[in-house]
């Protein structure tokens, strides 16, 4: 809370987006206060929205085998609902390519869809391909480019009630992320800097891109680059008068 206050004091114009569902759950436990009270204190300090990660796959079978100490799927959904009902927007994710079945992926998407119908609090869906290198599942083959694109397309069709689909280029790879812009994704993410999580798990993508790099990827996919803020308000539309492309946010 003190850190958020200091950030807002220095730059009140900055939108502070922080804390996954798992981290909010931990904060609530440490504070020993009701969720609503913790959220009110975070809002007063200057928290604006949350990334909403930590869902992985909701399947209880996978949860028990791979991450038994993590926030349960039922509690994740319950917490997300309360966060949305308290006025915060979040993203949502699905980690695929571990030991889950196709049916378990569909169940995960259905639960996200149901919650979105109820709260309208998700602004972006981000499918995340599992990178097995340097993990206890390194014997598993990572999702193919085709499977990664299929996950984007299925997400766009299934979750038509969520406004945006993100093609996270660090996870997908540049060529797949570019192709994803024609498969349902409308957000390529930003320039980033020194990403660690996926690179420690074997990702070979660049750790950062320039704005020019991203614009080139988007234009080559037949889309027009539009810089946005966290809540998808347009900051700069980089299209020119000759562009007839659909927009893609960065």
Spans of features found by a protein language model:
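Conserved Radical SAM active-site core
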Residues: 1-115
């Amino acid at each position: 809370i003190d850190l958020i206050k200091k950030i807002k004091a220095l730059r009140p114009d900055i939108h502070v987006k922080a804390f996954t569902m798992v981290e909010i759950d931990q904060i609530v436990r440490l504070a020993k206060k009701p969720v609503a009270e913790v959220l009110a204190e975070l809002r007063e300090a200057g928290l604006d929205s949350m990334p909403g990660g930590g869902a992985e796959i909701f399947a209880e079978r996978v949860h028990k085998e791979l991450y038994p100490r993590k926030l349960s799927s039922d509690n994740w959904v319950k917490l997300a609902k309360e966060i949305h009902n308290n006025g915060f927007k979040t993203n949502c994710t699905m980690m695929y390519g571990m030991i889950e079945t196709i049916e378990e992926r569909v169940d995960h998407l259905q639960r996200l869809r149901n919650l979105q119908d109820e709260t309208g609090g998700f602004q972006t869906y981000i499918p995340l391909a599992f990178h097995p290198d340097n993990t206890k599942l390194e014997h598993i083959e990572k999702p193919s480019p085709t499977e990664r694109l299929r996950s984007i397309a299925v997400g766009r069709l299934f979750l038509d009630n969520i406004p945006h689909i993100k093609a996270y280029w660090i996870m997908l790879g540049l060529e797949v992320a570019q192709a994803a812009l024609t498969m349902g994704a409308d957000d390529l993410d930003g320039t980033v800097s020194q990403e660690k999580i996926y690179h420690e798990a074997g990702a070979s993508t660049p750790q950062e891109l320039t704005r020019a790099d991203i614009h080139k990827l988007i234009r080559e996919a037949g889309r027009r680059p539009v810089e946005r803020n966290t809540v998808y308000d347009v900051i700069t539309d980089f299209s020119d008068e000759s562009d007839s492309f659909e927009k893609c946010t960065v």
